Amino acid sequence: SGRRTWAATSAAGIKAGLGLEATAHSPCVTATPEKRRATLDRMRDAGISNVRALRGDPPQGETEWTATDGGLRYSRELIELIRDEYPEFAIGAACFPEVHIHATDAESDLRYTKEKVDAGAGFLITQLFYDNRCYYEFVGRAREIGIDVPIIPGIMPITNAGQIRKITSMCGSDIPERLQAELELRADDPAAATDFGVAYATLP
């Protein structure tokens, strides 16, 4: 599909144009293993080295995730496919400092993260977060159960306050009260809100 081609070409463009290593997303949603292999072939041919294996969100307009007929159900299955058939890729997976929105509890969510690592994920990228304590606490719990791969913070600077509220509500991330208050102060000045959001996400 166009979106899958876009993922490959965007990551390749970042690598070629900026000299930065990029990670292309490879979701299970709406794809059979055959389609997923075709996408992975394009990524490999484009010179991409890093692939982030995801289950993916429900298609636009739908609220429940359902597997495509004959498709993969879990990101772990996609990780295993890439591990076995595309050894040239470094495989990344998602993790959730504030717990996946559909997880039963934090413990089971973390156990599933370990299953992804055991299946072949060599690094993890977190869901976005705006409270560093969530990240550090998550890393500590992950290390305690034997997850020893790099855990990379997922950073999303706030450039649109309304949009970020929608995104965080969808993924279960929290916006701290102090950050909420600062955004409210700049509600009528989008440029100031963007400047603050970028500074909040990037400064120590």
Placement of each model-derived feature along the sequence:
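Active-site beta-loop-alpha junctions enriched in small/polar residues
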Residues: S1, H25-A31, L54-P58, A94-H100, ...
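Catalytic beta/alpha-barrel core
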Residues: S1-R3, S26, S49-L54, G122-D131, ...
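Active-site-adjacent beta->alpha loops and helix N-cap segments on the catalytic face
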Residues: G2-I14, T32-A38, D57-I82, A103-A106, ...
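Short, acidic/polar
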Residues: A7, P33-D41, T104-E115, G197-P204
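Structural preference for beta-strand elements that scaffold enzyme active sites
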Residues: E21-H25, N50-R52, E88-A94, G122-F123, ...
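Conserved, mostly hydrophobic/aromatic
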Residues: M43, K116, G120, P153
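Active-site pocket-lining/capping segments in soluble small-molecule metabolic enzymes
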Residues: D69-F96, H102, I145-L203
